[in-house]
């Protein structure tokens, strides 16, 4: 028998403010020791391709939880962001840590057919790999120190530092691009929801979700050139005024009786 484990709320942050995705209920088909439900809080980290995740992320005996939500905003968000079968949403939990490393715990939310599921990232194997790599580096370092000249060691250290700098630069660039795209999505979502409210369109109306999605997709298409430049790292953020004008034009068109 399925049992509700907890309720998850997570934040999408941006320069224009924060949007909270609320009331995501996690249910399990497996028996658990705890009988009380709790509330988890989290922060959106990024979108991932599930097919490209390392094998250690998900163990074979890991629990997969079913996700439900009565929130129209949450339903619209997941419908928009999980259209691709292999896409996942990474959430860092604010009040839960990995028991072994005491590092933040992470959930990945994904869609399987028509069902919304999630699982917690398993860091156990990663820590084992990290430990083995650290030990191997120490052993190699001792061997090289005994047979190498001081100058060659300096070169190795310098090359290692240069590789680290190059990796960090690439990561910072990707994070900057993701931040711009996330800011666009957050601002667009808020403008659409606000425009629907101003027009007295309640989320209880049958075509509410369809109208939201059609407006969202049309706005993305309208600004496709700017979004393409952003994805290449050469574009500026789409201005709030430009996006607001697009949404108003689309809503006038789609809600015209």
From Swiss-Prot:
Compartment(s) where it occurs, according to its Swiss-Prot or TrEMBL record: Nucleus; Cytoplasm, Cytoskeleton, Spindle pole
One BP term from GO: DNA replication
Position of the signal peptide: none
Cellular component terms (Gene Ontology): cytoplasm; nucleus; spindle pole
UniProt cross-references to InterPro entries, sorted A to Z: Sld7, Sld7_C, Sld7_N
Primary subcellular site in the record, as a coarse category: nucleus
Any coiled-coil regions, as ranges: none
Record keywords: Cell cycle, Cytoplasm, Cytoskeleton, DNA replication, Nucleus
Family: Belongs to the SLD7 family.
Protein's name in the database: Mitochondrial morphogenesis protein SLD7
């Amino acid at each position: 028998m399925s049992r509700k484990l907890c309720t998850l709320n997570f934040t999408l942050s941006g320069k224009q403010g924060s949007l909270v995705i609320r009331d995501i209920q996690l249910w399990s088909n497996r028996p658990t020791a705890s009988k009380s439900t709790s509330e988890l809080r989290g922060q959106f980290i990024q979108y991932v391709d599930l097919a490209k995740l390392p094998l250690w992320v998900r163990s074979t005996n890991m629990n997969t939880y079913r996700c439900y939500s009565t929130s129209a905003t949450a339903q619209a968000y997941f419908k928009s962001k999980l259209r691709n079968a292999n896409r996942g949403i990474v959430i860092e939990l604010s009040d839960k840590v990995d028991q072994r490393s005491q590092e933040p715990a992470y959930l990945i939310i994904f869609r399987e057919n028509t069902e919304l599921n999630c699982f917690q990232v398993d860091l156990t194997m990663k820590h084992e790999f990290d430990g083995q790599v650290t030990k191997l580096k120490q052993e190699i370092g001792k061997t090289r120190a005994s047979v190498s000249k001081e100058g060659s060691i300096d070169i190795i250290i310098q090359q290692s530092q240069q590789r680290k700098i190059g990796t960090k630069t690439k990561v910072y660039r990707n994070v900057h691009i993701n931040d711009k795209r996330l800011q666009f999505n957050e601002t667009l979502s808020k403008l659409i929801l606000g425009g629907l409210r101003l027009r007295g369109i309640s989320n209880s109306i049958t075509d509410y979700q369809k109208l939201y999605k059609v407006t969202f997709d049309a706005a993305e298409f309208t600004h496709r050139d700017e979004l393409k430049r952003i994805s290449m790292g050469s574009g500026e953020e789409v201005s709030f005024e430009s996006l607001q004008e697009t949404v108003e034009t689309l809503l006038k068109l789609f809600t015209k009786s």
